[in-house]
């Protein structure tokens, strides 16, 4: 039995991160026990040597399950769905499943990046705060249309 079979999962998360929300929701819907580890992005805790040793990408959420570390919300959710098939998150019907993947990818690729603090700060630095809001609103509305 691997160490991931017997160890409690740890979720490194920032309370306001929509990416982290997705994983917390999935863990709860699947009824999985995990330990919540707060990472304060505003204080730069994701950039500390300790966190970067665990997760060189410096992203939250990050899920640790035994010797496995996964640092992307959709990858984490896919791992949970495969590893713990009880209480499935996805429908069995292939077409409905594909629509779920489509919605998840639109959020992850087209909407969420414009809610990311690093992206918003960069846009504001280069173009100003009015342009930052304009960019973010444009891409978020487009993703939901």
UniProtKB/Swiss-Prot annotation:
Keywords: Transferase. Induction: Accumulates in response to the phytohormone ethylene. Glutathione binds at residues 17-22, 60, 72-73, 112, 116-118. GO terms for cellular component: cytoplasm. Residues 7-88 form the GST N-terminal domain. It comes from the Eukaryota. It catalyses: RX + glutathione = an S-substituted glutathione + a halide anion + H(+). Disulfide bonds: none annotated. Its EC number is 2.5.1.18. One of its GO terms (biological process) is L-phenylalanine catabolic process. GO terms for molecular function: glutathione transferase activity; maleylacetoacetate isomerase activity. InterPro entries: Glutathione-S-Trfase_C_sf, Glutathione_S-Trfase, Glutathione_S-Trfase_N, GST_Zeta, GST_Zeta_N, Thioredoxin-like_sf. Residues 93-145 form the GST C-terminal domain. Conjugation of reduced glutathione to a wide number of exogenous and endogenous hydrophobic electrophiles. Belongs to the GST superfamily. Zeta family. This is Glutathione S-transferase 2. It comes from Dianthus caryophyllus. The gene is GST2.
């Amino acid at each position: 039995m691997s160490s991931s079979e017997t160890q409690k999962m740890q979720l490194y998360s920032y309370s306001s991160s929509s990416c982290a929300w997705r994983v917390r929701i999935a863990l709860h819907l699947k009824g999985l026990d995990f330990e919540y580890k707060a990472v304060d992005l505003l204080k730069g805790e994701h950039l500390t040597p300790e966190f970067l040793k665990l997760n060189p990408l410096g992203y939250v959420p990050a899920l640790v399950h035994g010797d496995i570390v996964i640092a992307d919300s959709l990858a984490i959710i896919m791992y949970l769905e495969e590893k713990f098939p009880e209480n499935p998150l996805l429908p069995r019907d292939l077409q409905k499943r594909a629509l779920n993947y489509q919605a998840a990818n639109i959020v992850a690729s087209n909407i969420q990046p414009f809610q990311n603090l690093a992206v918003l700060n960069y846009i504001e630095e280069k173009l100003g705060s009015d342009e930052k809001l304009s960019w973010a609103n444009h891409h978020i509305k487009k993703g939901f249309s």
